[in-house]
């Protein structure tokens, strides 16, 4: 819980791990129940929360569930980025609009989902069946616009945390590892499950530890 978050962050740092925390964008337009809610839409509460996050050593935030592209929401994106920058926090947007040059305006902007991302593989088998086909399109369509926070690289064949049920992955481990290079985003959030740390081939884990997330240039190969 919130009262133990500082202990959690300290433990992560002892393992040389930095932490991003998830938030809902909230607001009167947003009726989701997943919390924490009502922290990001109110300027006073948001600034106080971000100061607290900085003080306990959080590296960044992932803000989710934005309500369309109306002017008020577009202003909210930039307000979150600006306040986060003031507090040394990086920002990932999820459930959001396409990025619009924010990487040139805010040095703490990491990336945006704005794509039918990896979570859909868990929702429906259809997305697993089409994963390889869609992966051939993303670099030439969505990812040309800006950083794409796909959150992929599944190593379980069955897409639940215990690898014993749910949808069936149709792609190989090598394919999954390749998406860490194919899909450009300054931070790659791998879809690891706890059992992967003991069950996955060590070569896969070593690759995920070492693969770069930023590149000097990107070239399309015909």
Question: What is each PLM-predicted segment?
Answer:
Residues 1-172:
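Aromatic- and carboxylate-enriched substrate-binding clefts and catalytic-loop regions
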Residues 165-166, 175-191:
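Catalytic domains of carbohydrate-active enzymes that cleave complex glycans
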Residues 86, 115, 182-184, 188, ...:
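Short, well-ordered loop/turn and helix-capping segments at boundaries between secondary-structure elements
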Residues 192-222:
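Glycan-recognition and catalytic regions of carbohydrate-active enzymes
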Residues 1, 20, 186-192:
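Generic hydrophobic/packing signal
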Residues 153, 181, 207, 211:
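Residues that form generic nucleotide/phosphate-binding pockets
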């Amino acid at each position: 819980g919130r009262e133990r978050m500082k202990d959690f962050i300290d433990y992560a740092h002892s393992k040389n791990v930095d932490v991003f925390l998830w938030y809902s964008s909230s607001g009167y337009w947003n009726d989701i129940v997943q919390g924490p809610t009502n922290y990001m839409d109110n300027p006073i509460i948001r600034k106080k929360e971000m100061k607290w996050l900085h003080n306990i050593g959080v590296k960044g935030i992932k803000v989710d569930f934005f309500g369309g592209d109306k002017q008020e929401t577009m202003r909210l994106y930039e307000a979150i980025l600006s306040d986060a920058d003031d507090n040394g926090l990086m920002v990932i947007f999820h459930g959001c609009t396409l990025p619009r040059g924010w990487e040139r305006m805010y040095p703490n902007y990491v990336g945006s989902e704005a794509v039918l991302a990896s979570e859909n593989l868990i929702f429906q088998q259809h997305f697993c069946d089409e994963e390889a086909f869609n992966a051939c399109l993303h670099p030439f369509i969505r990812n040309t616009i800006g950083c794409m926070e796909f959150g992929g690289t599944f190593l379980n064949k069955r897409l639940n945390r215990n690898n014993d049920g749910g949808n069936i992955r149709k792609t190989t481990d090598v394919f999954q590892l390749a998406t860490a290079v194919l899909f450009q985003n300054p931070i790659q959030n791998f879809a690891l499950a706890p059992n992967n740390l003991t069950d996955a081939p060590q070569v896969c884990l070593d690759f995920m530890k070492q693969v770069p997330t930023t590149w000097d240039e990107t070239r399309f190969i015909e």
